[in-house]
């Protein structure tokens, strides 16, 4: 009997003790439990992955909606700015037209006033010149007669 025989006997006894203590069943149950745990973890990971994909799709959808809404807001703001610009341009043009018309009216009034002033000055000068000429040429007797005639005309016009 050599050492190999005793090693074989020891191995058989060891395996018998393991079989008696039901170690292979415990190892099998442990492996089955671990396999079930891994299976559950894989199922949970698949569920979490699906949820993550749904959340990602929802995020992308919301992002696209937000981009569309932002585009709509920008387009609306551009339309409003264009309308405000057109209103401001129209109001400015109307203001300039009113100011031009007012300036033209003032110029026309000033022209009329200037013409009237020139006419009045011309009349005053003519009256003064005529008065001087008449005063130089008319004697006292003729002046008295002219005064009486003018007085009678004024009286007849007043009555």
Curated annotation (Swiss-Prot):
Record-annotated membrane-spanning stretches: 1-21
UniProt keyword annotation of Amino-acid biosynthesis present: no
Record-linked CDD domains: ATP-synt_Fo_b
Primary location recorded for the protein, binned into one broad class: membrane
InterPro entries documented for this protein: ATP_synth_b/b'su_bac/chlpt, ATP_synthase_B_chain
Keyword Acyltransferase set for record: no
Lineage top rank: taxon: Bacteria
Signal peptide range: none
Membrane protein topology class: Single-pass membrane protein
Keywords per UniProt: ATP synthesis, Cell inner membrane, Cell membrane, CF(0), Hydrogen ion transport, Ion transport, Membrane, Transmembrane, Transmembrane helix, Transport
Record-level GO cellular component terms: plasma membrane; proton-transporting ATP synthase complex
Compartmental location: Cell inner membrane
One MF annotation (Gene Ontology) recorded for this entry: proton-transporting ATP synthase activity, rotational mechanism
Pfam families for the chain: ATP-synt_B (PF00430)
Role played: F(1)F(0) ATP synthase produces ATP from ADP in the presence of a proton or sodium gradient. F-type ATPases consist of two structural domains, F(1) containing the extramembraneous catalytic core and F(0) containing the membrane proton channel, linked together by a central stalk and a peripheral stalk. During catalysis, ATP synthesis in the catalytic domain of F(1) is coupled via a rotary mechanism of the central stalk subunits to proton translocation.
Matches recorded under NCBIfam families: PRK09173.1 (NF006611)
Similarity comment: Belongs to the ATPase B chain family.
Record note on quaternary structure: F-type ATPases have 2 components, F(1) - the catalytic core - and F(0) - the membrane proton channel. F(1) has five subunits: alpha(3), beta(3), gamma(1), delta(1), epsilon(1). F(0) has three main subunits: a(1), b(2) and c(10-14). The alpha and beta chains form an alternating ring which encloses part of the gamma chain. F(1) is attached to F(0) by a central stalk formed by the gamma and epsilon chains, while a peripheral stalk is formed by the delta and b chains.
Entries under HAMAP family matching the protein: ATP_synth_b_bprime (MF_01398)
Protein name: ATP synthase subunit b 2
Organism: Brucella anthropi (strain ATCC 49188 / DSM 6882 / CCUG 24695 / JCM 21032 / LMG 3331 / NBRC 15819 / NCTC 12168 / Alc 37) (Ochrobactrum anthropi)
Lineage, uppermost ranks: Bacteria, Pseudomonadati, Pseudomonadota, Alphaproteobacteria, Hyphomicrobiales
